Amino acid sequence: MKLHELKPNEGARDVRKRVGRGTSSGTGKTAGRGQKGQKARSKVRLGFEGGQMPLFRRMPKRGFKNINRKEYAVVNLNDLNRFEDGTEITATVLIEAGVVKNELSGVKVLANGELNKKLNIKVSKYSEAAKAAVEAAGGSIEVI
């Protein structure tokens, strides 16, 4: 016996019902869909609830997608401690170091954690608390 000769046990697998293959097959002509009507013709569309007001129309409309939304790559102060003292930090430096994956609309520095290094930071945005922490550590931060 070889692998290609293996067969499942009798009755272990159901035979697929082939419909619409002539009247003598028992499932010809209307193919088990009965006579006329919506379900006899084609599929009922997605979300159809038999004429009842569908769920997506019963719920109120909410919000919108702002096409001008800017999303910034966030960097916290404790992420910046990996750099050497006096390093100039830009978006490209952060991407190369693996701190952020991509720049998105720019990089924003937030004040989560502590900064122990004197760094020169040039980013798109920063919080006031982050600015205070960077300057307290002896560094500088500016918007480019």
Swiss-Prot record:
<dbReference type="InterPro" id="IPR005749">
    <property type="entry name" value="Ribosomal_uL15_bac-type"/>
</dbReference>
<feature type="compositionally biased region" description="Gly residues">
    <location>
        <begin position="23"/>
        <end position="35"/>
    </location>
</feature>
<comment type="subunit">
    <text>Part of the 50S ribosomal subunit.</text>
</comment>
<keyword id="KW-0689">Ribosomal protein</keyword>
<dbReference type="GO" id="GO:0006412">
    <property type="term" value="P:translation"/>
</dbReference>
<dbReference type="GO" id="GO:0022625">
    <property type="term" value="C:cytosolic large ribosomal subunit"/>
</dbReference>
<dbReference type="GO" id="GO:0019843">
    <property type="term" value="F:rRNA binding"/>
</dbReference>
<dbReference type="InterPro" id="IPR036227">
    <property type="entry name" value="Ribosomal_uL15/eL18_sf"/>
</dbReference>
<comment type="function">
    <text>Binds to the 23S rRNA.</text>
</comment>
<keyword id="KW-0687">Ribonucleoprotein</keyword>
<keyword id="KW-0694">RNA-binding</keyword>
<feature type="compositionally biased region" description="Basic and acidic residues">
    <location>
        <begin position="1"/>
        <end position="14"/>
    </location>
</feature>
<keyword id="KW-0699">rRNA-binding</keyword>
<protein>
    <recommendedName>
        <fullName>Large ribosomal subunit protein uL15</fullName>
    </recommendedName>
</protein>
<dbReference type="GO" id="GO:0003735">
    <property type="term" value="F:structural constituent of ribosome"/>
</dbReference>
<dbReference type="Pfam" id="PF00828">
    <property type="entry name" value="Ribosomal_L27A"/>
</dbReference>
<comment type="similarity">
    <text>Belongs to the universal ribosomal protein uL15 family.</text>
</comment>
<feature type="region of interest" description="Disordered">
    <location>
        <begin position="1"/>
        <end position="43"/>
    </location>
</feature>
<dbReference type="InterPro" id="IPR030878">
    <property type="entry name" value="Ribosomal_uL15"/>
</dbReference>
<dbReference type="InterPro" id="IPR021131">
    <property type="entry name" value="Ribosomal_uL15/eL18"/>
</dbReference>
